[in-house]
């Protein structure tokens, strides 16, 4: 009996697909066939011995597959699922499974023979559910169920992870974990208002819901922070990655016909906080991006509370800095603001000597000191979380981490961050992006990062100028001897040489000329302008000056550049200036590529 599938189970499911998509369907046992990964989920064919149907498991069950609990050719019982059309193929269906349990491990082969009725398993649902909208659920709990609620018999509450744009009606039970302000907008179609809320269900899954105009005015006062609601009659679409604030592929829109009812007079729930941790050594790719990140680390130090004056209203707000480290042997400074600085920040200061592990959700990544993290209004800090990641991190720190030499993640990026407000690992573009957009930098300079090779350095160009040793400004030869600095209004007997040169760079998409000044040019050439001038003055069979320039070519660098417009003979031209130069960190480059691949997979 245990090694049997439900006879005609798939046919039964398909025969009842006209039921409301949120209805409780019969539990059936199927065989898992052709199990394979698809992004962060797994797909397979559900087999009942006679028929097959394509199916998808949620990401929450990936751990069961990795551990071997769910196996290819094994049997599973489908507890909660929906049947949907494959877009563009109305004749084909697929099952989106939200809850299942393993029945048997892998069988010797795929079940193909027709199964006798006596061996089938047709399980009835364990519970009977009453079909109802959000308002009807509340009315029933208050003892005044509407007639429509008594007529329908199968509606249930959906977990957020099960929602998709192809479903019909659904009802969710969620807590408001963040509420935005009412904003106004103006476009070609007129004026309007909009606001957003972030909703979290009992499993910790989050989704952003947006309301416009009439819906915004209707629900703005109804939604209150921290309260739990039943919501139905909304719509879903793919989330706009540029504006989304939570980890969900979809976003929700509520209109004036949507139903939102507070779940009062019943047992409440506290959502489980789900984290998607980013290792500290990978934070550079998120600098000044819209993405909010989660981080976990061991507390290295905690500063006293300081007061910072806010620019927009001159109000003094509390701030506290903490330094975190993780197994990548990198550290990062996290700024706690407002109540987090004075509340949980004080707790961390009191226990700093014990080096607790903390997990922080929803952090903004900035470019101060190369890379830094800051809390925002929706940030959540958990001290010594009960999680495998925290246990592993604490064990590493106690065993070896506390004796390990650490370095700040932003130490190699600070110069670039100070000259363009971004790190070397954000705003990465190919040269063709710049050369094919001649209008870049018309209004103000724009900044990019690019990886390119030095392909040519013109040897007969003016590569340096005479500079004052005090202020680095240009000097002129004095009438009698020495050099005169107009800026310092003084004469010196000696001056220094400082680079001002042009270099041609190339990548796989094209080439262009960059202007490089002293500090950046020294990193490119590998010596000071004074040293290069000495080589140029030397005589001998080997031209050391030319050799030095050749050594500098066909070497790869990470460049932080600014693009501006310069007028020459009444014609505007692009001027591309080097603001920072760094050697290639191949480990960081590999992580960047892997992250891009992961993002592309997620978007597909």
Swiss-Prot record:
GO BP terms in the entry: DNA recombination; DNA repair; DNA replication; response to UV-B
Any one GO molecular function term: DNA binding
UniProt-listed InterPro entries: Euk_RPA1_DBD_C (IPR047192), NA-bd_OB-fold (IPR012340), Rep_factor-A_C (IPR013955), Rep_factor-A_N (IPR007199), REPA_OB_2 (IPR031657), Rfa1 (IPR004591), RFA1B/D_OB_1st (IPR003871)
Keyword ATP-binding assigned: no
Assigned keywords, A-Z: DNA damage, DNA recombination, DNA repair, DNA replication, DNA-binding, Metal-binding, Nucleus, Zinc, Zinc-finger
Major localisation: nucleus
Effect of a null allele: No visible phenotype under normal growth conditions, but mutant plants have increased sensitivity to genotoxic stresses and agents that damage DNA bases (UV and methyl methanesulfonate, MMS).
A cellular component term, taken from the record's GO annotations: nucleus
Subcellular location: Nucleus
Pfam families tied to this protein: DUF223 (PF02721), Rep-A_N (PF04057), Rep_fac-A_C (PF08646), REPA_OB_2 (PF16900)
DNA-binding feature ranges: 170-256
Zinc finger (C4-type): 468-488
Assembly behavior: Heterotrimer of RPA1, RPA2 and RPA3 (canonical replication protein A complex).
Family: Belongs to the replication factor A protein 1 family.
Role this protein plays: Component of the replication protein A complex (RPA) required for DNA recombination, repair and replication. The activity of RPA is mediated by single-stranded DNA binding and protein interactions. Probably involved in repair of double-strand DNA breaks (DSBs) induced by genotoxic stresses.
Protein name: Replication protein A 70 kDa DNA-binding subunit B
């Amino acid at each position: 009996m245990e090694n049997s599938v439900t006879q005609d189970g798939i046919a039964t499911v398909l025969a009842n697909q006209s039921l409301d998509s949120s209805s409780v369907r019969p539990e059936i046992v199927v065989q898992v066939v052709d199990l394979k990964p698809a992004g962060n989920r797994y797909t397979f064919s559900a087999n009942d011995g006679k028929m097959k149907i394509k199916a998808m498991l949620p990401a929450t069950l990936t751990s069961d597959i990795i551990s071997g609990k769910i196996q290819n050719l094994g049997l599973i019982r489908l507890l909660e699922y929906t049947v949907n059309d494959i877009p563009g193929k109305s004749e084909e269906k697929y099952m989106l499974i939200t809850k299942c349990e393993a029945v048997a491990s892998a069988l010797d082969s795929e079940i193909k023979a027709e199964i006798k009725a006596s061996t089938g398993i047709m399980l009835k649902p364990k519970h009977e559910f009453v079909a109802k909208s959000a308002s009807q659920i509340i009315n029933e709990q208050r003892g005044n169920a509407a007639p429509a609620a008594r007529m329908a018999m199968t509606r249930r509450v959906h977990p957020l992870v099960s929602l998709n744009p192809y479903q019909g009606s659904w009802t969710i039970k969620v807590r408001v974990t963040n509420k935005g302000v009412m904003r106004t907008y103006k476009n070609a179609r007129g004026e309007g208002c909009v606001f957003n809320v972030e909703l979290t269900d009992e499993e910790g899954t989050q989704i952003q819901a947006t309301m416009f105009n009439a819906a915004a005015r209707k629900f703005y006062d109804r939604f209150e922070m921290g309260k739990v609601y039943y919501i139905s009659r909304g719509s879903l679409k793919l989330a706009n990655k540029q504006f989304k604030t939570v980890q969900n592929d979809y976003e929700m829109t509520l209109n004036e016909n949507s139903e939102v009812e507070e779940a009062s007079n019943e047992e409440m729930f506290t959502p489980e906080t789900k984290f998607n941790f980013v290792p500290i050594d990978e934070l550079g790719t998120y600098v000044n991006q819209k993405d909010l990140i989660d981080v976990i680390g061991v507390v290295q130090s905690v500063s006293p509370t300081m007061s910072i004056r806010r620019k927009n209203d001159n109000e003094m707000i509390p701030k506290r800095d903490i330094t975190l480290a993780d197994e990548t042997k990198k550290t990062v400074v996290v700024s706690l603001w407002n109540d987090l600085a004075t509340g949980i920040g004080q707790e961390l200061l009191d226990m700093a000597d014990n080096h607790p592990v903390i997990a922080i959700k929803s952090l903004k990544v900035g470019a101060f000191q190369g890379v830094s993290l800051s809390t925002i209004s929706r940030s959540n800090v958990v001290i010594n979380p009960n999680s495998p990641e925290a246990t592993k991190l604490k064990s590493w720190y106690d065993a070896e981490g506390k004796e390990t030499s650490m370095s700040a993640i932003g130490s190699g990026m600070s110069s670039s961050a100070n000259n363009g407000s971004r790190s070397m690992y954000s705003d990465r573009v190919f040269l063709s992006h710049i050369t094919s957009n001649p209008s870049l930098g018309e209004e103000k300079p724009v900044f990019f990062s690019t990886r390119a090779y030095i392909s040519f350095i013109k040897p007969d160009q003016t590569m340096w100028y005479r500079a004052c040793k005090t202020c680095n400004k240009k000097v002129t030869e004095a009438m009698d001897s020495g050099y005169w600095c107009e800026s310092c209004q003084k004469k010196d007997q000696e001056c220094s040489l400082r680079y001002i040169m042009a270099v041609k760079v190339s990548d796989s998409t094209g080439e262009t000329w960059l202007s490089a000044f002293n500090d950046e040019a020294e990193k490119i050439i590998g010596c000071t302008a004074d040293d290069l001038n000495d080589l140029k003055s030397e005589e001998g069979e080997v031209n050391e000056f030319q050799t030095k320039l050749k050594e500098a070519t066909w070497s790869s660098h990470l460049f932080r550049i600014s693009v501006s417009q310069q007028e020459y003979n009444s014609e505007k031209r692009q001027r591309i200036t080097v603001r920072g130069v760094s050697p290639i960190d191949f480990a960081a480059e590999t992580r960047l590529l892997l992250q891009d691949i992961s993002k592309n997979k997620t978007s597909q």
